Amino acid sequence: MKKTIVAVMVAASAVLSAQAMATNTAQVTVLGEVADAANSCVVTPTGTLNNGIVQLITVTIAEANAEAAGTLFKTQDFGFKVTDCAQGSANPVTGLTVNVAGVTSSDKTILDNTAAGGATGIGIGIQRLSDSHRVAFDGSDTMTESYSATTGTQLKYTTGYVKVNSATPVTEGPVKGVATFTIDYTI
């Protein structure tokens, strides 16, 4: 039987913006899950992932424009710890498959900035810490990890800003990228 766990990570920052706003807005993300408790895993956020959000450090326009296009910068580490798979059984889960999806334009490794009134020329990237591989958000990049019933499995990543290209200067504004992590396991 194949089971799927979906975890959403949002990387967001009030980047480059010191504007006074007369409008009050709020964003609410509602997530839920229905699972068979006897045949499921516990996925716990780690690192700087707090309530599905990684808050990046503010970067100035000059700092962002000085970066090479396609380079991850001003990073924050985060991850997921997967434990207690198939509770009450003799460790039938031996591996996990992780896939990440998100909105991209021309470069499948850069999440589009989806913030309203957002900065231009900049996006969000995610890199696996285990092998420094930049994650592709088009579903083509699948990572397989072993699973230990005694210690669980740590899925470790870093995320940060990415200058989209050298021809487009970075402008001020908020930055937001949303990545959906799907963790599959077999029972």
What is each stretch, according to the model?
Residues 1-22:
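Gram-negative bacterial Sec-dependent N-terminal signal peptides
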Residues 20-187:
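Mature extracellular/passenger domains of Gram-negative fimbrial/pilin and adhesin proteins
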